[in-house]
Amino acid sequence: SPKVFGPQGPKIDETKILSGHPAEMKLAEFDPAILEPGKYILFTQDVTAAIGPWGASFAANLTPDNETGIGTWQPEMFINALRTGKHLGAGRPILPPMPWEMVGKLTDEDLKAVFAYLKSIPPIKNKVPDPKPLDQLLSSK
């Protein structure tokens, strides 16, 4: 979830809870040498984006917004995505740092409960950027 920063550090921005990486937040400059496998993974200041040897990945909008979130998803789509590690169960890979391998081990009943909770929170319109492969990130530097 996006964060707000105060005197005691970052706190979840409750007006944007579970809405993913803020569309307007740009990635900071970085030294590509630190992305070699076995070195570092970089995170944005609010931990909604990660940069590593795979490229850049962004926290998804998990709110029930029909256009930018999971509003049109069905429980089976959610479960299949977390079991296969594929977006919508058949698309692009779900990238780090999302621990889909661990979450996907939950029972169907537990995953349906998580999905029901996500569908119950307020929808927030936030178009999260698409993942960027490492070569695309490096060519834009």
Please name every model-derived segment:
Residues 1-57, 75-76, 87-141:
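Flexible coil segments in periplasmic/lumen-exposed cytochrome c-class electron-transfer proteins
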Residues 58-61, 66-72:
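Mid-length scaffold segments of soluble, non-membrane domains
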Residues 65, 84-88:
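Short hydrophobic alpha-helical module
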Residues 70-82:
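Aromatic- and charge-enriched surface segment that lines or borders ligand/interaction sites
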